[in-house]
Design a protein with these regions (language model features):
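S-adenosylmethionine
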Residues: 1-154
Length: 155
Protein backbone atom coordinates (compact mmCIF):
# COMPACT_ATOMS: atom_id res chain seq x y z
CA UNK A 1 0.00 0.00 0.00
CA UNK A 2 2.87 2.34 0.80
CA UNK A 3 4.18 1.91 -2.72
CA UNK A 4 0.76 2.68 -4.24
CA UNK A 5 0.00 5.74 -2.11
CA UNK A 6 3.46 7.27 -1.95
CA UNK A 7 3.41 10.51 0.05
CA UNK A 8 -0.30 10.03 0.91
CA UNK A 9 0.46 6.83 2.84
CA UNK A 10 0.80 8.57 6.23
CA UNK A 11 -2.59 10.29 5.77
CA UNK A 12 -4.05 6.91 4.84
CA UNK A 13 -2.79 5.40 8.11
CA UNK A 14 -4.12 8.34 10.14
CA UNK A 15 -7.64 7.81 8.79
CA UNK A 16 -7.84 4.57 10.80
CA UNK A 17 -7.43 6.59 13.98
CA UNK A 18 -10.42 8.81 13.16
CA UNK A 19 -13.90 7.95 14.50
CA UNK A 20 -16.12 6.01 12.14
CA UNK A 21 -18.84 7.90 10.25
CA UNK A 22 -22.32 6.37 10.54
CA UNK A 23 -24.92 7.43 8.02
CA UNK A 24 -28.49 6.95 6.94
CA UNK A 25 -30.29 7.98 3.78
CA UNK A 26 -33.94 9.02 3.96
CA UNK A 27 -36.28 7.13 1.62
CA UNK A 28 -37.91 10.00 -0.25
CA UNK A 29 -40.29 7.49 -1.85
CA UNK A 30 -42.04 7.19 1.52
CA UNK A 31 -41.33 10.43 3.39
CA UNK A 32 -39.87 13.85 2.66
CA UNK A 33 -36.61 14.81 4.30
CA UNK A 34 -38.41 17.63 6.12
CA UNK A 35 -41.07 15.30 7.54
CA UNK A 36 -38.49 12.72 8.56
CA UNK A 37 -36.48 15.33 10.45
CA UNK A 38 -39.64 16.22 12.41
CA UNK A 39 -40.06 12.63 13.63
CA UNK A 40 -36.40 11.52 13.81
CA UNK A 41 -35.92 9.87 17.19
CA UNK A 42 -32.25 10.93 17.50
CA UNK A 43 -30.07 13.86 16.51
CA UNK A 44 -28.96 13.91 12.88
CA UNK A 45 -26.37 16.03 11.08
CA UNK A 46 -26.63 16.57 7.31
CA UNK A 47 -24.13 14.98 4.95
CA UNK A 48 -23.10 18.13 3.05
CA UNK A 49 -23.05 16.54 -0.42
CA UNK A 50 -26.18 14.33 -0.16
CA UNK A 51 -29.56 16.08 0.17
CA UNK A 52 -31.22 13.11 1.91
CA UNK A 53 -28.14 11.81 3.75
CA UNK A 54 -27.41 12.26 7.45
CA UNK A 55 -24.79 11.36 10.03
CA UNK A 56 -25.83 9.85 13.36
CA UNK A 57 -23.94 8.78 16.47
CA UNK A 58 -23.63 5.04 15.93
CA UNK A 59 -21.95 4.53 19.26
CA UNK A 60 -25.07 5.73 21.09
CA UNK A 61 -28.05 4.54 19.03
CA UNK A 62 -29.12 1.48 17.04
CA UNK A 63 -31.24 2.67 14.09
CA UNK A 64 -31.42 -0.85 12.60
CA UNK A 65 -33.68 -1.82 15.52
CA UNK A 66 -36.09 1.09 15.19
CA UNK A 67 -39.60 0.67 13.69
CA UNK A 68 -38.83 3.41 11.13
CA UNK A 69 -36.09 1.18 9.72
CA UNK A 70 -38.52 -1.72 9.33
CA UNK A 71 -41.02 0.66 7.72
CA UNK A 72 -38.40 1.50 5.08
CA UNK A 73 -38.13 5.19 6.00
CA UNK A 74 -34.34 5.11 5.76
CA UNK A 75 -31.40 2.99 4.65
CA UNK A 76 -28.24 2.65 6.72
CA UNK A 77 -25.28 3.49 4.53
CA UNK A 78 -21.79 4.93 4.95
CA UNK A 79 -21.95 8.51 3.64
CA UNK A 80 -19.31 8.07 0.93
CA UNK A 81 -21.26 5.06 -0.41
CA UNK A 82 -24.30 7.32 -0.94
CA UNK A 83 -22.45 9.38 -3.54
CA UNK A 84 -22.51 7.21 -6.71
CA UNK A 85 -26.30 6.80 -6.90
CA UNK A 86 -26.83 10.42 -5.88
CA UNK A 87 -24.62 11.72 -8.70
CA UNK A 88 -26.28 9.73 -11.49
CA UNK A 89 -28.79 11.79 -13.45
CA UNK A 90 -31.70 9.37 -13.16
CA UNK A 91 -35.10 10.65 -14.27
CA UNK A 92 -38.55 9.10 -13.77
CA UNK A 93 -39.18 6.78 -16.72
CA UNK A 94 -35.53 5.74 -17.18
CA UNK A 95 -34.40 2.13 -17.41
CA UNK A 96 -31.65 1.51 -14.86
CA UNK A 97 -29.35 -1.49 -14.46
CA UNK A 98 -27.47 -2.02 -11.19
CA UNK A 99 -25.05 -4.96 -11.31
CA UNK A 100 -23.41 -6.22 -8.11
CA UNK A 101 -26.45 -4.64 -6.51
CA UNK A 102 -26.60 -6.39 -3.12
CA UNK A 103 -27.31 -5.41 -0.43
CA UNK A 104 -29.25 -2.60 -2.11
CA UNK A 105 -27.81 0.75 -1.06
CA UNK A 106 -27.43 2.10 -4.58
CA UNK A 107 -30.43 0.20 -5.93
CA UNK A 108 -32.84 1.66 -3.37
CA UNK A 109 -31.70 5.22 -4.13
CA UNK A 110 -31.86 4.64 -7.89
CA UNK A 111 -35.34 3.15 -7.51
CA UNK A 112 -36.49 6.12 -5.43
CA UNK A 113 -35.25 8.49 -8.16
CA UNK A 114 -37.47 6.68 -10.68
CA UNK A 115 -40.55 7.71 -8.63
CA UNK A 116 -42.50 4.62 -9.70
CA UNK A 117 -41.87 5.18 -13.43
CA UNK A 118 -39.42 3.32 -15.64
CA UNK A 119 -37.68 0.15 -14.53
CA UNK A 120 -34.88 -0.81 -12.15
CA UNK A 121 -33.08 -4.09 -12.82
CA UNK A 122 -30.94 -5.04 -9.83
CA UNK A 123 -28.63 -8.02 -10.27
CA UNK A 124 -26.20 -9.86 -8.03
CA UNK A 125 -24.22 -13.04 -8.67
CA UNK A 126 -24.94 -14.42 -5.19
CA UNK A 127 -28.35 -15.93 -4.50
CA UNK A 128 -28.02 -15.35 -0.75
CA UNK A 129 -27.06 -11.68 -1.24
CA UNK A 130 -29.85 -11.25 -3.79
CA UNK A 131 -32.38 -12.22 -1.11
CA UNK A 132 -31.19 -9.33 1.06
CA UNK A 133 -31.26 -7.04 -1.96
CA UNK A 134 -34.89 -7.92 -2.72
CA UNK A 135 -35.82 -7.46 0.96
CA UNK A 136 -34.35 -3.95 0.95
CA UNK A 137 -36.03 -3.05 -2.35
CA UNK A 138 -39.37 -4.25 -0.94
CA UNK A 139 -38.84 -2.30 2.31
CA UNK A 140 -38.21 0.82 0.26
CA UNK A 141 -41.44 0.34 -1.68
CA UNK A 142 -39.77 0.13 -5.09
CA UNK A 143 -42.45 -1.49 -7.24
CA UNK A 144 -40.95 -1.11 -10.70
CA UNK A 145 -38.06 -3.52 -10.28
CA UNK A 146 -36.64 -6.72 -11.66
CA UNK A 147 -34.45 -8.63 -9.20
CA UNK A 148 -32.13 -11.31 -10.44
CA UNK A 149 -29.39 -13.55 -9.07
CA UNK A 150 -27.01 -15.14 -11.52
CA UNK A 151 -26.54 -18.85 -10.97
CA UNK A 152 -23.46 -19.01 -13.18
CA UNK A 153 -20.40 -20.36 -11.40
CA UNK A 154 -17.37 -18.14 -11.14
CA UNK A 155 -13.97 -19.51 -12.01
Amino acid sequence: MKHLLGEEYEDYLKCYEEPRHYGLRVNTNKISVEDFLKIAPWPLRPVPWISNGFYYDGDQIQPAKHPYYFAGLYYLQEPSAMTPADRLLIEPGDRVLDVCAAPGGKATELGAKLQGKGVLMANDISNSRAKGLLKNIELFGIGNKIGRASCRERG
